[in-house]
A protein has these predicted regions:
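Small, basic N-terminal interaction modules of short regulatory proteins
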Residues: 1-85
């Protein structure tokens, strides 16, 4: 569980990034066309990329720290889609 998630949102392209921790980027694993998880070389999660969160909402399945991510997204009125495939 992490309490220091930082959400950045670019309205012009409807894209969000949630920073989990500051570290050098090593690789990204795409969960689907709208979601990717960024990792450091040690395998720790450093961020979450979300495309079209305002237009399509955000699925939590497969995301790390789903409770914290949900709270951050709902705080800026993004629709959270739990249990949807």
């Amino acid at each position: 569980m992490t309490n220091n998630l930082l959400l950045e949102y670019d309205e012009s392209v409807d894209a969000a990034y949630i920073t989990v921790k500051e570290a050098d980027w090593d690789h990204q694993v795409r969960l689907d066309d709208a979601r990717g998880i960024d990792y450091a070389a040690d395998g720790s999660v450093i961020g979450i990329e979300i495309l079209s969160p305002r237009r399509k909402g955000v699925r939590l399945d497969g995301l790390p720290f789903p409770g914290d991510v949900s709270r951050v997204l709902q705080a800026v009125s993004f629709r959270v889609l739990e249990g949807v495939r």
